[in-house]
Amino acid sequence: MPQAPKSLSIDSDAAVVAAAAADDLVRASSPRPRTTTFTPSRPTVLLTKSWTSATVLPSTTSTRITVGANTSTATDAASSISQHEPSTSSNSTRASTPLPELSPSPFSPQTAVAEALTREQQPAGPSDDSQSRSILPHASDHSTPCNSDQATEVAFHDAADVEPEAVGTTVSSSIHALDLLHRVNDRAAAERASNSESLRSHLSRLSVSRASSKHRSRSNSRDASTQTRALPPAFLGTKQAAPSAASAVTQTSLRDEAKDGDRQLYDTSSAPSHEEEQYPDRKYYILSSAGKPIYISHASLSRRKRRREKRRRQRRAESNESDLNSNESDEEDESSTTQVGVMQALISIFADEDSDKLRFIRRGDLLITFLLRAPLYLVCVSSWNEEPSTLRQHLEYLYLQVISLVSASQLTRLFGRMPNFDLRRLLEGTEGIFDYLVNQLNANETEDDDAEQGQHQVATGGVEAKRAVTDWASCHQWWLQALQPIRITVPNLRDQLTAALQPPTAEAGSSTQPHRPKDLLYVLLCANGRIVTLLRPRKHSVHPIDLLLLTNMVMGSRSIKRSGGSEDAEIWLPLSMPKFAPHGFVHAYVKFLDPESWIGSRREGSEMVGDAKMTSSELAVIVVTGDKDAFPTVSAWISSLVAQPPAHWADNTADDAGDAGDAGSIRTTDIMAKRAASKKQAGKSAKPTQTELASWMTHFQRHILTLCRHLTDASNIEQGSPRVSAYTCAELGLAGLRHFVYRSNSTIQLTSPSLPDPYASDAVHRKRLLTLYSLVHHQIHHPLPASASHSESSSSSTTAPPTGMLNGVFGTPASSHPRLSADTRLKMHLVKSHHEQILGWITSPFELYLCLNPQLSKSAIVAVANSLTKWIKSNENDLFLVNAGSF
């Protein structure tokens, strides 16, 4: 038996302060009290079992709050592992994952202290022997009966890639924050008998994870008391498939919560009464180490929404509630400031002499994740029932977005001179960039602010027409850290655009020809925020995160998009690329293209007839250079790629403005040219034909027009806006396939079709799908480390006893810190719910995530996956940027 941790003396006042701070944060972060209505669309428990088990049962819920920490010794973590399930597949390469025992010994010093504190400070009352410092569900917490024959669980662990977790116990003579939490937890267990909702009771039920820098390790070893995780409802079983057997697919299974004697690792709160409230928007906070707020997502989005509604009311002469909105804004800002203060206080409690870091706090479905990047603190509050590693990845992107606006060296210098520096003033006007990123992370529809300004409106009877501009594929780029180029089926068009964007050679520079910009880094052509083509220097690669942050900055800034409304507008902006040069700045040249103006289809005051037109904010050329004085050179080069139409062409197009509504569309340029050739008017030259049109255009312009015709073709139009994915799963003819995401590991690019209904139209279904994708991705990349005896590839089924797991992972010094390698990761993983099945399949060349019909059999799933990979391989040149240009 492992020895219980030593009990340290505590201060009652310090316990009260810590309890009050945590209680305020949990109360402020919870959207509303939840009812006990069961909703089967949320996952609850992930189970290790064979393929034949595919039962989905309702789960009981609980509002119990659990306590865990990452400072246990490796021996304690190993000794707490319980018996694993005996059922394994014949194709498994390792034994089933053992279940960790999280209940502490009843003879721990914390229990004795709790009893002493209860006798001294709490009035006498009825007690329950079953209530102790444990995360077992209480009988009164369940809203529905549970089935003990079907109630099991599996360890679902947190990622350790960003912040290495602690190994070993830190013992100090001073008051330790973890000891404080243990003592408060023990006392609250005794107080729970009287059903009192005190501050100490709330803190005792918090699930806290922390990491200590004193014992940091690069290994992926985890504490068994904190790495377990319950999935959202309706999911089915997992086991590892043999690397050589593609048909051996793992499967997860949904079970009820455990009865008395079974170990429930994490309780889930009751489902909300309305299905729409299942996935409320995550709340993201960025604050300084001094506690000053820098960015608060829900407050910024609310202000943005109020401004949009105010503009609408002003146009409709209905601005009668301005005072009410201002009061709501003040109350929201005050509440957000209070929450930021509580977060800063909680982080400070754990920032003791050992430099411990608070990682996350869990209460049922509510998860509060922390990311400390001095001098900034980033916090995310979510109730999507997902993994902390997913939220930490989101917070990392927000931090990198800050670094892209203010370099890391400048950030350190500012806060080094003034620790209470207000960074929000320096970042004023960039809220739209963060809002655009948060909307993608939350899978929300993106509002077209240009339409609110009257640039993209259809005034028919005074009713505004809202264009669908949301690209759901942008959500996949973040959790897979890969770019998704636009699919182009026109032969050689991508290569032609790449050749047209080749920078001029340095020797060719003259008075009539442009020079090559100094320190040229990247040249990009983007459509709707998606990469069309890319050029880079030879022997130099570009990180996809840098390009994602760059395109997010361009598409998310209202000022940049407003400036790009004119063909003559050119934007020159400094930025930092965190993965390329985080301590310095580069400069980006942005020019939005307006192909409609090249063929003369625009006129002042004209309406946007036809939905197939590309607007000026959808197509852009971006040039990144390290020379801050290169703007004139870059401007001259890009301007030489876009020729202006002749004067007589502009005059004649105004006379033909009253032709058919589709005459001004790019895809009808051929018809327009033929019609113009037959229309001869006295005193005026004929409108140029297609040959004359091509005579004054550059090669770049002609290729751009071909691209626009392709993107605005009737088969590529979705809900009134160009569809950048350009294909659906229905076009592939694979029965049962609803959606997929394919990541090519060689090119670090991905492809995915457009979301079908109900995922595209219903936010609940869409967010559930993305949550399942992230959970499968986490389980594949961060499984429980296998024992040394099962790390070798084997096709036979073996069942090792718990002692084998102890001796293999923690028993020998050589394997005291087991590492996860590509051989020990899961190859396939299946999650099944009432609505869909999600399959994750990882190999060396690719990663594939499928959304399939829940009634599909395992053999049909394997057939769909194999057929899909063959189709992607045959269309690789259309889906990916295979031959990136270089100079």
Swiss-Prot record:
Extent of Low complexity compositional bias: 71-80, 784-803
Main location (coarse class): membrane
Q: Which BP terms in the Gene Ontology apply to this protein?
A: autophagy; protein targeting to vacuole; vesicle-mediated transport
In this chain, composition skew of type Basic and acidic residues spans 254-265
| Ranges of Polar residues composition bias in the record | 81-95
Location comes to: Endosome, Multivesicular body membrane; Prevacuolar compartment membrane; Vacuole membrane
Q: What does this protein do?
A: In complex with CCZ1, is required for multiple vacuole delivery pathways including the cytoplasm to vacuole transport (Cvt), autophagy, pexophagy and endocytosis. The MON1-CCZ1 complex acts at the fusion of vesicles with the vacuole, through its regulation of the SNARE complex during the coordinated priming and docking stages of fusion, and particularly at the stage of tethering/docking.
Query: What's this protein's name?
Result: Vacuolar fusion protein MON1
What organism does this protein naturally occur in? Mycosarcoma maydis
